[in-house]
UniProtKB/Swiss-Prot annotation:
Name of the protein described by the UniProt record: Small ribosomal subunit protein uS11
Any GO molecular function: structural constituent of ribosome
Gene from which this protein is expressed: rpsK
Listed GO CC annotations: ribonucleoprotein complex; ribosome
Source organism (scientific name): Alkaliphilus oremlandii (strain OhILAs) (Clostridium oremlandii (strain OhILAs))
GO biological process, alphabetically ordered: translation
Family: Belongs to the universal ribosomal protein uS11 family.
Gene3D superfamilies with a match to the protein in the record: Ribosomal protein S11
Length: 133
């Protein structure tokens, strides 16, 4: 006689609401995409959004508007955890740097500090060759 296997029920763990007032906003803006991560002061992520995640595809991912929408989405999610003030760390040469910072301020977060943390090589890797269009 065959035994009937028990159904396994998986419980989805609800994200607990953290009460964090101060945090950091890490904006990584490349030539292809913009990634915004909001963290607490130790660097533990509260929320994250990117232009590609929001449905922007191809060359539209690298626009300032896409970075603005990504920053807005990440800010709203982080503000649910009680985030009020942020220190902004910007990395990369992309078009969405300033747009993302302005969007964080417009969403209601107070920006205390803006710091450029773009890594600069001391003559490391050879850069890509010039594009010929």
């Amino acid at each position: 006689m065959a035994k009937v296997a028990k159904k396994r029920t998986t419980r989805t763990r609800r994200r607990e609401r953290k009460n964090i007032e101060r945090g950091q906003a890490h904006i990584q803006s490349t030539f292809n995409n913009s990634i915004i991560t909001l963290t607490d002061m130790q660097g533990n992520a509260l929320s994250q959004a990117s232009a590609g995640q929001l449905g922007f595809k191809g060359s539209r991912k690298s626009t300032p508007y896409a970075a603005q929408m990504a920053a807005e989405t990440a800010a709203k999610a982080a503000m649910e955890h009680g985030l009020k003030t942020v220190e902004v760390y910007v990395k990369g040469p992309g078009a969405g740097r300033e747009a993302a910072i302005r969007s964080l301020q417009a969403a209601g977060l107070e920006v205390n500090l803006i710091k450029d943390v773009t890594p600069i090589p001391h003559n490391g890797c050879r850069p890509p060759k010039r594009r010929r269009v």
